[in-house]
Amino acid sequence: MPKRDDIKTILVIGSGPIVIGQAAEFDYAGTQACLSLKEEGYRVVLVNSNPATIMTDAEMADKVYIEPITLDFVSRIIRKERPDAILPTLGGQTGLNMAMELSAAGILDECNVEVLGTDLTAIKKAEDREAFRDLMNELGEPVPESDIIHNLDEAYTFVERIGYPVIVRPAYTLGGSGGGICHNEQELIETVTSGLKLSPVTQCLLEKSIAGFKEVEYEVMRDANNNAMVVCNMENIDPVGIHTGDSIVVAPSQTLSDREYQLLRDVSLKIIRALEIEGGCNVQLALDPDSYNYYVIEVNPRVSRSSALASKATGYPIAKLAAKIAVGLTLDEVRNPVTGTTFAHFEPTLDYVVAKIPRFAFDKFEQADRRLGTQMKATGEVMAIGRSWEEALLKAVRSLEIGADHLLLEEAENADEATLERKICFPEDDRLFFLAAALRRGQTIEQLHAKTKIDLFFLYKLSKTIELENRIKENPQNQEILAEAKRAGFSDAFLATCWNVDEQAIYDLRKAQNLFPVYKMVDTCAAEFESTTPYFYSTYEEENESTRSAKESVIVLGSGPIRIGQGVEFDYATVHSVWAIQQAGYEAIIINNNPETVSTDFSISDKLYFEPLTLEDVMHVIEIEQPLGVVVQFGGQTAINLADGLAKRGVKILGTSLEDTDRAENRDAFEKALGILQIPQPAGKTATSVEEAINVATDIGYPVLVRPSYVLGGRAMEIVESEEALKHYMTNAVKVNPKHPVLVDRYVSGQEVEVDAISDGENVLIPGIMEHIERAGVHSGDSIAVYPAQRLSSQVKNTIVDYTTRLATGLNIIGMLNIQYVVDGEEVFVIEVNPRSSRTAPFLSKITEIPMANVATRVILGENLIDLGYTPGLAPEKQEIFVKVPVFSFAKLRSVDTSLGPEMKSTGEVMGKDVTLEKALYKGFVASGTTMHDYGTVLLTVADRDKEEAVELAKRFNRIGFTIMATKGTASTLEEADIPVSQVKKIGENQETLIDYIRNGQVTLVVNTLTTGKRPERDGFQIRRESVENGIPVCTSLDTAEAILRVLESRSFELESMNTSEVKQPKARV
């Protein structure tokens, strides 16, 4: 079938901000789709609210709208651009839900817009739990016994019939949001209430729990001619009951017999044909390990997280081909871009094993509930490829960057028996390490299988790894065992620990017997056809398939798995750096291990190595490629942390030298540099013991800001207001010693300002100055950033430009740097300098039209800013206002405090752009998911220090028609200021409390600032959690509340009675 010529313009809907359950995989899918459609000659219009994505670059579509993905804004874009069709299946759950909303509102009919890929009927059949169950019954495919419920009474009726445990699956939600396994009535009430609130159609499926079955996924494709094929099948190591996004996954499946594989394959193809999906689809199935019985769990009628994994695991570009199928091309017409000779209907064949391990943010959220279930909690994932499951697993473990280079975690090894049993029987994010610890203590694989239902095959493989560990320890420096260990995926670092030598000694041992990895090609066809894919993985075999080209090359280190503090922004910079290297005439090589990202699309670079970002693994690639140098500025702290080890092995680090990087990151060296440059910073010192920290704090005065040196995302950073609190921090939050000092600074409660700059060593370009809405003390990644700065005087701006220029040249920066300042009146203090790319670089690149990573890379390669066409100094400011608003995933992480502070908590961001600050903020808030009510009730409960400021906010809320509700202390303050207020009871009082009002939907906005003391802290935490779980916006900073208020005021109107009166009535606004 030829591609369709009756459509000219296609609207692609993106997935919006990064949240748990919907991450960088949709930037990868959307980028592929836009390029694929443009390749076919279509005019592409894109809407996405996330500025930190490659897909929102101007080159990716004919028209790019960085606007909220809401019915209002997408309808406006459709009416303006008049697309012939929309493609929603590459924008995750956001894209599907938006297509359904547009249809329900009549916009698609009104503007005569066709839905491509998966039609609305198929979306409804797959996403609506009742329609899906009915379809499976029609097809004769088994689903677990279930019922559709719309309220708690219906849930009780179902449970009375089949008993506990039951699984709750809300309709039209992402990453299992609101769902879970319920073992008792209390869990049922909590989960069903949450699920019904989060489901856009107030619908949940309750089903009999089949926890313990094997969970298997099939990634399938279908075209308009009803050709269908399996791209990849994947097996979850964890059985049914844990969300697939939180499971360790292996591809291809390892424990299915041929009969089981074919049985489930046939079911998957039958389902995609029944749904008449044109494109990609993910089918999840549960298989009884003791029989051939199976159930269909669910179908994602779109490109998904698993699609990205399947694409990277096989090399088969699912999103690219799904876009071509959506416009009428068929699988037997489209060439497989991997081989260039075969067609897309050939099913990929793997002669290697792929392991995926999820990455969690529990290092940031120590109080979070780490228990895994049907609601996803991982922020990202890593993938590794090997010739065996053991090798792939161990490579994936060391890719996680959790301080483990092997299946060995200190907490697991030192756990008492009760903790060990709990961690094995009730799975958390680190269960893999506790399984290894149990095997070391002598538990059998049969015992572990009985407790976990993990297949004996995987437990057997783990036990063989532990057995090999023991032989390694018993035979120090034995060459045969060394070779066996390397083939099994063991790292030099772990072997060095076993033999009590350093890593270099292990390397020398390997060198003596020429024991080095070779690189194999990912070619989709197990070498059956000739392939030229520049996509490689390492393994210890004989034949090497990666050969160095004659062209000079540059290696760019990626940023690894997405986590809080190091997100998709760094992948954005990595991709742009690669393109700049290619433009400069060099071969660009990427090393990375994240299957979700654009950077690990093999078509982006000249060569892709899918490898752990450890010194050993990176050095192996360097030895074979012999690059001109390595770029570390764009891979976040992951890449920066490797720089020292690489330099010591003679590798040239391109850009800012190691010594100068250390001067920026090492506190004492940085203080000396600031002294020489005569740039002020808040008073502070480095402490290497608890006593020293107390002395420093006493000298400079409380409150103080404390943080460990060399961190990203403000990990373990805190504002401390007393000696008691400081002692608690020093003994609980950090392990302080001379090798790991802690920084103690005077806390300046001023206005925070952020600057990204590029330096060529002589000239410094400053694309823009951003101010934060929230005052200093809230992490920059969690603050609302505004460009151009609205509240800074010309004098302050000139000072910032002067300090930035002095810092860049004084620290000998070559490439990018990010500086954070605090402004107190007209005084400017530098807080920190990061000699690398930052999370604001994509945002600033988009709005200033200065491609920062590209320009910085050209500078790193030796060019200067003036020759590249840039004038040093501050770039001319834009007339429009741009805001970057953080997005949080608190609804997925129960028990996490939503209050903002120096430790970063946001998972993503959105952009708002308009002619006024209020309009830009409105777009930003709406795009972030904040519900903006024009009237309602504001609950105020604030700390004593904030009460005076809260009075002014309450007056303004009252003036535009909001009702004010407050707890006793805050209410008294408001009453004294003659502000009408309803006093509500605190938590624990016998009558109806503020929690009841929140749960009953009587509150539209909560403003709650942190109060010290155990009881107020506990109450504040409960208020904030209840607000999040009931979908109510909660502000823990008065600055954020004021920003929301500004927006609401801008949307209100003056209302004044025309009656004349001797007593002049105050104006009211609503």
From Swiss-Prot:
Pathway annotation from the record: Amino-acid biosynthesis; L-arginine biosynthesis; carbamoyl phosphate from bicarbonate: step 1/1; Pyrimidine metabolism; UMP biosynthesis via de novo pathway; (S)-dihydroorotate from bicarbonate: step 1/3
Keywords: Amino-acid biosynthesis, Arginine biosynthesis, ATP-binding, Ligase, Magnesium, Manganese, Metal-binding, Nucleotide-binding, Pyrimidine biosynthesis, Repeat
Binding-site positions, Mg(2+) 4: E832, N834
Record-listed Mg(2+) 1 binding positions: Q284, E298
The MGS-like domain, residue ranges: 930-1070
Residues involved in ATP 2 binding: R707, R746, V748, E752, G777, V778, H779, S780, Q820, E832
Reported function: Large subunit of the glutamine-dependent carbamoyl phosphate synthetase (CPSase). CPSase catalyzes the formation of carbamoyl phosphate from the ammonia moiety of glutamine, carbonate, and phosphate donated by ATP, constituting the first step of 2 biosynthetic pathways, one leading to arginine and/or urea and the other to pyrimidine nucleotides.
UniProt-recorded name of the protein: Carbamoyl phosphate synthase large chain
